[in-house]
C-alpha cells in the first residue's frame, strides 16, 4: 500500500528524518505553551480549570487522532494523510494566532492543531513497521524516541524565552514551520493502493463524546457530564463488542498484562502531566518568577534528563527485570512529590532538582510499560495494541492536565488540609502533591500484586 522508491533505499532514512521533525513539532506543540498557562489565565482572567483547556483541547484531538490515523493508514495512502495532517496543523496554528484574544477561537484553533499534529507520531510508526526489518526497527525507534525527547526538553525552554521576550501568542505559529516538509514528502513518497477496509466511525464518535464529557466533568465537576460520560461509554463498549471491525479490539480487555500496562501507564502519565502543568502556577504564586525562568531553570533540566534516564532504564530492565525498574520509577516520582510538598516554600531550586527525578521516574515507568504491553501481544495484535497504548498515553496526559486545572480552581482544597505549617497560598499545591504521591504508591502496589499473581503471563 505504501512504499518508497526502491532504487534509492538511502532516501528512506531521509524520509525518516523529516518525519521525526514532524513528530518533534507535535511534541513541542504540547509542551511549549505549558509555562505560559499562568500568563494566559491572567490575559483572559480565567481560572486554571478553564485555562488548562488550551493544552487539554490539543491533547484531546491529538490522542483521538493518533488512533484514527493509524486506522486510516490501512486504506488511505500515508502520503495523503501526512499532507492533510500538516495542512490542518498549520491551519489550526493560524486560527489560534489570529484569534488569540478570543478564548473560544483560541481553543478551536488548538483543537484543529491537535487533529493535524496527531498524524505525525502515529504514521511514523506505520512507516517504520512497513519499511524496516524487525532487526533494525530498534535503532529507528531509538532515533524517533531521541527526537521526541528533545522536543519535550526544548519545549518549555523555547516557550519561556518567546513568551517572556515577545508574547505567548507567537508560540501558536511555531508548528507552521512544518509546511516546508510538504514539497519534500510529495517528491520522495509515492502514493500506495487503498484497501476496502472499513473504519468504525460510530465507535470513534461514541468514544470521542464520552471522553469530552469526562474532561468537561473534571473542569467544573458538574455531575451531568459524568452521567453522560457513563452512558456514552457503556454504549461504546456494547458497540465494539458487536461490530466486525471495531475501533478498539475488545479481546484486548482479556489480556491481563496488557490491561495492567494500560492502566498503570495511563494513571502515571496522567499524574505526571498534571504535575508538569501545575509547576508554572506554583512558581508564579510562591516565587513570582517569569516564564523564561520557569521554562529554562525549573522545567528544562528535568525534561532533558529523560534522554539519559531512558537509556539507563532500558539497561536496568534487561539486568534487573521490569518489576524492579517499575518500582524504582514509582518510588522516584512519589518521593519527589512528597519532598516538594513538604518543602514547597524552601527554595525554587529544590523543585528544579526534584523535577529531574520525577522525569527520571517517568522515563523508567515508560520503558517498563512499553515492554509489558509489547511482549503481551501476539503478532496480529501488535498494531492495534500499541496504537491503543499511544492513544491511552496521550489521552491520559490531557486528562491529567484537565483534572489538575479543575483542582486548582476548587476552593475545597485551597486550604491547609495536610500540612499545617504550609502557608495558605502554598497549601493547594502541597495537598495535590501529597494526593499524587499516594496514587502513585497505590498504583505501584496494585501492579506488584497483579504482576506476582500473573507472573507467567509476563514472561
From Swiss-Prot:
The keyword ATP-binding does not apply. It is found in: Cell membrane. Gene3D superfamilies: MFS general substrate transporter like domains (1.20.1250.20), Multidrug resistance protein D (1.20.1720.10). It is a multi-pass membrane protein. One of its GO terms (biological process) is response to antibiotic. Its main location: membrane. It comes from the Bacteria. InterPro entries: MFS, MFS_dom, MFS_trans_sf. Keywords: Antibiotic resistance, Antiport, Cell membrane, Hydrogen ion transport, Ion transport, Membrane, Plasmid, Transmembrane, Transmembrane helix, Transport. The chain crosses the membrane at residues 12-34, 49-68, 81-100, 105-127, 140-162, 166-188, 201-218, 223-240, 261-283, 293-315, 322-344, 348-370, 391-413, 428-450. CDD domains: MFS_MMR_MDR_like. GO terms for cellular component: plasma membrane. Belongs to the major facilitator superfamily. TCR/Tet family. This is Tetracycline resistance protein. The gene is tet.
Amino acid at each position: 500500500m505504501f512504499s518508497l522508491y526502491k532504487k534509492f533505499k538511502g532516501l528512506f532514512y531521509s524520509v525518516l528524518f523529516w518525519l521525526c521533525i514532524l513528530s518533534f513539532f507535535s511534541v513541542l506543540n504540547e509542551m511549549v505553551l505549558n509555562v505560559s498557562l499562568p500568563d494566559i489565565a491572567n490575559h483572559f482572567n480565567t481560572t486554571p480549570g478553564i485555562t488548562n483547556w488550551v493544552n487539554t483541547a490539543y491533547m484531546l484531538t491529538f490522542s483521538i487522532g493518533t488512533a484514527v490515523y493509524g486506522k486510516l493508514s490501512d486504506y488511505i495512502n500515508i502520503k495523503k494523510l501526512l499532507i492533510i495532517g500538516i495542512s490542518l496543523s498549520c491551519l489550526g496554528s493560524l486560527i489560534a494566532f489570529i484569534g488569540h484574544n478570543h478564548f473560544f477561537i483560541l481553543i478551536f484553533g488548538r483543537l484543529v492543531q491537535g487533529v493535524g499534529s496527531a498524524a505525525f507520531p502515529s504514521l511514523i510508526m506505520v512507516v517504520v513497521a512497513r519499511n524496516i526489518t524487525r532487526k533494525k526497527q530498534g535503532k529507528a525507534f531509538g532515533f524517533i524516541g531521541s527526537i521526541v525527547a528533545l522536543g519535550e526538553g526544548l519545549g518549555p525552554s523555547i516557550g519561556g524565552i518567546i513568551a517572556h521576550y515577545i508574547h505567548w501568542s507567537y508560540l501558536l505559529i511555531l508548528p507552521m514551520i512544518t509546511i516546508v516538509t510538504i514539497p519534500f514528502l510529495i517528491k520522495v513518497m509515492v502514493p500506495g493502493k487503498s484497501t476496502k477496509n472499513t473504519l468504525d466511525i460510530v465507535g470513534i464518535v461514541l468514544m470521542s463524546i464520552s471522553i469530552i464529557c469526562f474532561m468537561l466533568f473534571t473542569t467544573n465537576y458538574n455531575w451531568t457530564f459524568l452521567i453522560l460520560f457513563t452512558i456514552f461509554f457503556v454504549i461504546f463498549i456494547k458497540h465494539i463488542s458487536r461490530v466486525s471491525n471495531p475501533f478498539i479490539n475488545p479481546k484486548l480487555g482479556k489480556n491481563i498484562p496488557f490491561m495492567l500496562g494500560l492502566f498503570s501507564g495511563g494513571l502515571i502519565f496522567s499524574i505526571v502531566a498534571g504535575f508538569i502543568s501545575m509547576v508554572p502556577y506554583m512558581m508564579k504564586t510562591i516565587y513570582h518568577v517569569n516564564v523564561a525562568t520557569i521554562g529554562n531553570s525549573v522545567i528544562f533540566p528535568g525534561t532533558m534528563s529523560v534522554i539519559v534516564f531512558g537509556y539507563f532504564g532500558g539497561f536496568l530492565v534487561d539486568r534487573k527485570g521490569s518489576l524492579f525498574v517499575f518500582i524504582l520509577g514509582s518510588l522516584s516520582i512519589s518521593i519527589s512529590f512528597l519532598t516538594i510538598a513538604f518543602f514547597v516554600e524552601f527554595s525554587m531550586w529544590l523543585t528544579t532538582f526534584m523535577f529531574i527525578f520525577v522525569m527520571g521516574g517517568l522515563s523508567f515507568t515508560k520503558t517498563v510499560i512499553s515492554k509489558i504491553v509489547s511482549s503481551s501481544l501476539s503478532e496480529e495484535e501488535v498494531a492495534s495494541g500499541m496504537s491503543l497504548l499511544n492513544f491511552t498515553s496521550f489521552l491520559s496526559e490531557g486528562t491529567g492536565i484537565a483534572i489538575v486545572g479543575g483542582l486548582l480552581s476548587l476552593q475545597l482544597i485551597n486550604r491547609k488540609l495536610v500540612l499545617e505549617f504550609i502557608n495558605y497560598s502554598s497549601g493547594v499545591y502541597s495537598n495535590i502533591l501529597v494526593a499524587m504521591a499516594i496514587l502513585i504508591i497505590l498504583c505501584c502496589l496494585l501492579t506488584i500484586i497483579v504482576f506476582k499473581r500473573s507472573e507467567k503471563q509476563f514472561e
